[in-house]
Design a protein with these regions (language model features):
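Conserved adenylate-forming
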Residues: 1-71, 79, 158-160, 167-178
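Ser/Thr-glycine-rich phosphate-binding loops at phosphate-binding pockets of nucleotides
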Residues: 37-41, 103, 127-128, 223-225
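Conserved ATP-binding/catalytic segment of the ANL
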Residues: 60-127, 144
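A generic "binding-loop/recognition-motif" signal
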Residues: 81, 121, 138, 157-159
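C-terminal boundary motif of the adenylate-forming
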Residues: 106, 111, 144-170
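Adenylate-forming
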Residues: 115-143, 171-182, 201-205, 219, ...
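Conserved C-terminal "lid"/linker of ANL adenylate-forming enzymes
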Residues: 150-153, 193-252
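Conserved loop-to-beta-strand segment in the C-terminal subdomain of adenylate-forming
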Residues: 156-175, 198-212
Length: 252
C-alpha cells in the first residue's frame, strides 16, 4: 500500500540478491526478480516473470548470445555492445575480442538456459591448498542480516577463509559502541554459522573480526561507484587480518 497498491513485481540488479531476501519479498506478495547488465553491453538477461529461478539472473534477452570461456568467464554478444572505451584501444581490446564482450564475471548456465553468476574473475580466492572460492557469492548470503552493513572474505593463498564485518548502526550511528557489544558478536556469530551450514568445508568462515567503522571512499577502501577495494581493505586492516591467521583455526 505504501508503494501505491498496484506494485506486482520488482527487479534487482547490480549485486547478487540473497536467496533469503528474495524469499522474504515473495512471501509478502512482491516477487523480486533478478536481471543482469553492464555499461558496456546494456541489459543482458532477465528472469521470466512466469517462471523465475531463485539465485539466477535469468535468461538472455532476445538478440543476446551467451557463452562461457574455458575458465568460466561469461561472454556476451549482442547489438547493444559498446564500440569501445573512448581513446583507449588497449582497454577496449582487453574486453572486446572477436565480437564478444568479456564481462569479468564467472558464470554457470543450466540446461534450461538460466544463468548464475558465481563471482568476479579478478576477485577469485585461491587457498593455499588450491581450492577456488568466489567471495561475492558467499558475501551475498549475509545481505539478510540487519546488523551487518559490509562483509569482506579473505583467504587468498591462505589456509582457511576469514571475514571482516562492518555494522549497520541504524539511527544511533555508533558503530564503535556496537563493535564492543557481546550481543552484536553473538548475532554475527549466529549469522556466520547459518551461512557456513550452506557451504562446503573449504569455503566456510573459520574466524572473523567486527570492525568499528565502515569501509569508505575517503580511506581508499571503496571506489566512487561503491565497490570494495579488497587490497586496500587488507592493507588498512592488516593487524586484524594477521590476528585471524595466528594461533588456532576455530572461529572467533
Amino acid at each position: 500500500e505504501r508503494l501505491g497498491g498496484r506494485l506486482r513485481v520488482a527487479a534487482s540488479g547490480a549485486a547478487p540478491l540473497g536467496k533469503d531476501l528474495a524469499s522474504f519479498f515473495e512471501a509478502v506478495g512482491m516477487p523480486l526478480i533478478e536481471g543482469y547488465g553492464l555499461t558496456e553491453g546494456g541489459v543482458v538477461t532477465l528472469n521470466p516473470l512466469d517462471r523465475p529461478k531463485s539465485g539466477s539472473i535469468g535468461k538472455p534477452l532476445p538478440g543476446v548470445e551467451l557463452k562461457r570461456a574455458e575458465d568460466g568467464e561469461l561472454l556476451v554478444k549482442s547489438p547493444a555492445l559498446f564500440l569501445g572505451y573512448y581513446k583507449d584501444p588497449e582497454a577496449t581490446g582487453a574486453v572486446l575480442r572477436d565480437g564478444w564482450l568479456y564481462t569479468g564475471d564467472i558464470a554457470e548456465i543450466d540446461d534450461e538456459g538460466y544463468v548464475y553468476i558465481t563471482g568476479r574473475k579478478k576477485e577469485l580466492i585461491v587457498s593455499s591448498n588450491g581450492k577456488k572460492i568466489y567471495p561475492a557469492r558467499i558475501e551475498s548470503l549475509f545481505k539478510i542480516e540487519p546488523v551487518i552493513n559490509q562483509v569482506l572474505l579473505i583467504g587468498d593463498r591462505l589456509p582457511y577463509v576469514t571475514a571482516l564485518f562492518t555494522l549497520n548502526a541504524g539511527h544511533s550511528g555508533d558503530t564503535k559502541e556496537m563493535a564492543r557489544s557481546p550481543q552484536v558478536f553473538e548475532q554475527i556469530k549466529n549469522a556466520v554459522s547459518r551461512v557456513n551450514s550452506q557451504l562446503p568445508p573449504f569455503e566456510q568462515i573459520r574466524k572473523f573480526r567486527i570492525l568499528d567503522r565502515d569501509f569508505t571512499i575517503e580511506d581508499g577502501e571503496m571506489t566512487p561507484t561503491m565497490k570494495v577495494r579488497r587490497n586496500r581493505v587488507l592493507e588498512n586492516f592488516r593487524t586484524e587480518v594477521s590476528e585471524m591467521y595466528a594461533g588456532k583455526e576455530e572461529s572467533q
